[in-house]
Design a protein with these regions (language model features):
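Short beta-strand->loop micro-motif that forms the acidic, two-metal-ion catalytic signature
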Residues: 136-142
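C-terminal nucleotide
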Residues: 1-127, 142-183
């Protein structure tokens, strides 16, 4: 398997986006929960612990906090899946992450949602999610190496047909980790 990065090529500006609003909403949630729990960050809560204090939050603030807490749990699960060599589980977690970013954190947009959905429909793709701050940018997809060429061709065409402009694709590979090369 390899990672395929797809740039939706939607122009975006984080300063003018709702990115800072999301950060503020998470800070509001943290302060409210700190009234009853001694935590420094939402990441310290398990999803079960969050459910016990969710009543303190309302509306979008609750959704934003739920995303942060469940995303942290997914990261922990992803590390365990990687240690087991369970790439299919990692793909499932990527999909869940994208759904949470779309439905709870609301930072995806039609272009990123389209790229991720098209990727998930392709044979050989185990999972796909947006990366970065959102409101434009890129997705990553876990794709079987033998399927990459067809994956890019199919997703590119379907994305162009749906959105009206092309995405850019980059096939990446995971090497042996960080190395030092003496020049």
């Amino acid at each position: 398997y390899c990672i395929v990065v797809a740039n939706c090529n939607k122009p975006h500006n984080l300063v003018e986006s709702k990115y800072n609003v999301r950060r503020h909403e998470v800070e509001v949630a943290l302060k409210k929960i700190q009234e009853v729990k001694k935590i420094n960050a939402l990441a310290e809560l398990t999803p079960e612990e969050f459910n016990e204090v969710k009543y303190l939050l309302s509306g979008v603030v609750a959704k934003r906090a739920e995303h942060v807490v469940t995303e942290c749990a997914r990261v922990t699960e992803a590390v365990a899946a990687l240690k087991r060599g369970d790439i299919a589980e990692l793909g499932r977690l990527l999909n869940e992450s994208h759904y949470s970013l779309r439905d709870l954190y609301e930072v995806t947009g039609k272009e990123l949602d389209m790229l991720s959905a098209l990727a998930r429909k392709e044979a050989g793709c185990l999972g796909s999610r947006m990366i970065g701050a959102g409101f434009g940018g890129c997705t990553i997809s876990i794709v079987k190496k033998s399927a990459v060429e067809g994956f890019i061709r199919h997703v590119d065409k379907a994305y162009f047909d749906a959105i009206g402009y092309r995405a850019s694709f980059y096939e990446t590979s995971i090497e042996d980790g960080v190395t030092v090369t003496k020049l």
